[in-house]
A protein has these predicted regions:
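Short, surface-exposed recognition loops and adjoining beta-strand edges that mediate ligand/DNA contacts
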Residues: 32-34, 62-81, 195-281, 392-398
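Acidic, glycine-rich segments characteristic of secretory precursors and extracytoplasmic regions
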Residues: 19-68, 460-472
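Inward-facing hydrophobic residues that define packing positions of alpha-helical scaffold repeats
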Residues: 48, 110-113, 179, 186, ...
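Elongated scaffold/linker segments in the mid-to-C-terminal portions of large proteins
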Residues: 83-84, 97, 234-371, 426-472
Length: 472
């Protein structure tokens, strides 16, 4: 059976143009429409390759979008132009222009995964081991998309089919139901991807395990969170039993980093001027040498938190730009190297999952399980890498959880929306944002969930708006 795909180099972006669908996404203007059939081995391989371009290179949310949008939702980053003022000041509504990106992009990924899974079912054109690898990848991408949807919007339509007659009128499913589907997809992916031999820039069993550990943490299944994290963490100092090790601060985001569990190869900027050769994410956030400002810059609250301990090596992840009038702009500097494909040692990858998170997942779950020493040990792994002294504070539950929150903030700022989701899942959003200088005026508790885009409400009568946004 043939289907229309949008071909980008060797990959595809599925075009979802039906006005009756829950999605209404225009194809890229530079796309070349072609027939790709699932009846050939090459067609299936091309479709599977397309997941990576669609999700990690051309997706309006996953590649740069999480950093651009979600870093402004939380207390991390501001934009100099007024375009995103509503984001950083938490004054968005259902008609805000950027909200659909955070909804449509994940659903585009989900639709693609569903369509792929449906049309390779029973296929005999590839060896079962290879087909299982592609199925596992599709399940991972579906789980990954739903993870962000449920953490940004709460209850969302749960779609496991590409049938527009179903998707067009699907109601919202509870967060519990969505998380159950995420867990199911990841458990299947672990099995299907076993012994697939995928590298760190392709979905693997370890990538599914890393995301599953995070999901178990978010759903407060502490024993399971520890169990999954243990599969990735070294069993003893030196790394026995693990393929991953914490890297030096300057090497965390390099393509050769042993800390990386999953990453996407970045494309260099090929335009003209002083940005030529920088990775795409560096091109967006690093100020031009001649600029008198940074277009996107960190808020004082974040800078003060990271620099509270001057010896903390994570200060290197914050760049400085002296602007007009002597104003200092602090900007993201985790991705800063020129793209040099002939020198892999200095080539950066866009990191999606890394080992440091697994230490802090195990630490947090261990606190809730009463395994205090394990929690302290894991906290100290992160502190030690940052050149900080061992944790010497109280080992009371609340104090340890606050230390973990602090380390997560300093470790994962400007990464994958961690800070926004951390404060929401722990119930700390109100306490923090109500005291943040540029957020406290507009902050209301209901804003911890984003509004469902108004065009989706108008298109699907089964959808209801999140509380608080009905009058906006």
């Amino acid at each position: 059976m043939k289907h229309k795909y949008i071909v980008l180099s060797l990959s595809i972006t599925i075009s979802l143009c039906s006005c009756e669908s829950i999605l209404d996404i225009d194809p890229p203007t530079d796309s070349i429409t072609a027939d790709v059939t699932f009846s050939t081995s090459e067609g299936i391989r091309t479709a599977a390759t397309g997941f990576y371009t669609d999700n990690f290179l051309n997706n309006l949310m996953y590649y740069q979008g999480l950093e651009l949008y979600v870093s402004q939702l939380c207390d991390e980053m501001l934009a100099r132009s007024g375009q995103f003022a509503d984001l950083s000041q938490n004054n968005y509504n259902a008609s805000s222009s950027y909200i659909p990106n955070l909804w449509d992009a994940p659903y585009s990924s989900i639709y693609g995964a569903n369509d792929f899974l449906e049309h390779v079912e029973g296929s005999m054109v590839l060896p079962e081991s290879e087909l299982n690898k592609y199925r596992g990848e599709a399940l991972f991408f579906r789980a990954y998309a739903y993870f962000y949807l449920v953490n940004l919007f709460g209850d969302v339509p749960l779609l496991t089919t590409s049938d527009v007659n179903v998707t067009a009128k699907a109601p919202r499913a509870s967060k519990t139901e969505v998380y159950q589907q995420i867990v199911s997809d990841l458990l299947q992916a672990q099995v299907l991807l076993k012994n697939s031999g995928n590298g760190r820039t392709r979905i693997s069993t370890d990538a599914a395990t890393a995301l599953l550990a995070r999901v178990y943490l978010y759903t407060e299944q502490w024993d399971k969170a520890v169990s999954e994290a243990n599969k990735l963490l070294p069993t003893i100092d030196g790394g026995l039993g693990s393929n991953y090790l914490l890297e030096a601060i300057d090497r965390v985001f390099l393509s050769t980093s042993s800390e990386t569990i999953l990453a996407s190869n970045q494309e260099g900027f090929t335009g003209t001027g002083s940005y030529v050769g920088y990775t795409r994410i560096g091109n967006l956030f690093i100020p031009n040498e001649r600029a008198t400002y940074a277009s996107y810059y960190f808020c004082d609250e974040l800078v003060n938190a990271v620099r509270a301990e001057p010896e903390d090596l994570r200060n290197k992840w914050i760049g400085e730009k002296k602007g007009s009038g002597g104003k200092i702009y602090y900007f993201p500097y985790k991705y800063r190297n020129m793209m040099t494909p002939n020198n892999a040692a200095s080539y950066e990858s866009y990191v999606i999952l890394r080992l440091a998170e697994q230490y802090l997942i195990r630490a947090e779950a261990s606190v809730h399980l009463g395994h205090t020493q394990q929690a302290v040990n894991d906290i100290n792994k992160i502190r030690e890498r940052a050149a900080l002294s061992p944790y010497g504070g109280s080992t009371a539950k609340d104090d340890l959880l606050m230390e973990i929150e602090t380390q997560r903030r300093k470790e994962f700022f400007f990464e994958q929306g961690h800070r926004w989701m951390d404060l929401n899942r722990t119930g700390r959003a109100d306490a923090v944002y109500s005291k943040t200088s540029y957020k406290k005026v507009n902050w209301k508790a209901f804003r911890s969930l984003l509004p469902i885009p108004e065009q989706q409400i108008g298109r699907n009568r089964s959808l209801t708006q999140n509380p608080g946004y009905e009058s906006y």
